[in-house]
Amino acid sequence: LYYADIKQLLDEGYIERIRRGYYHWIESCETREIVIINTLFPDAVLCMETALFYYKYSDRNPAEWSFAIDRNVSKLRTNIEYPFIKAYRIEPELVTLGETTGKIDFTKVRIYDRDRTICDVLKNMSKMDKEIFNKAIQGYVNDPKKNIPNLMMYAKKLRVQKKVKELIGVWL
């Protein structure tokens, strides 16, 4: 396609710009947000509010997709207009720690497991909404699928052992 063709499709409302060089058909059912995220960020792992909602530790559907990505990746790569995203830049060796797979809208995704998600929540608790934080902790404590040895291993690697013992140890 030539630029003039793309411009015409944009002006007529058939396509929408995601970022430079990336567009999607507005009417297409294959342009779900998660498909776009998987395409643009195949190395990213869903985390924080997105993972909390996935595991039903939060009843609030996140306004933006949260994912962890290698901190050495260019910031320009995450500068997109749609969908709304929040990239957590972390150490390269920690990106795959606690990674598992799941399905969102029939699309396979990389997502952190329950235990890693709670460690991330504890690490970022000062930046989180208090209600979401409290529900996440209560949801995890009451979850029969929690894995305490994994939680403690992740807590050690992510340096949140003290918070885990203070905030979750009381409930276990």
Pin down the residues of each PLM region.
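A short, conserved structural fragment
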Residues: 13-20
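Short amphipathic alpha-helical interaction segments
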Residues: 1-11
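Nucleic-acid-binding surface
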Residues: 22-172
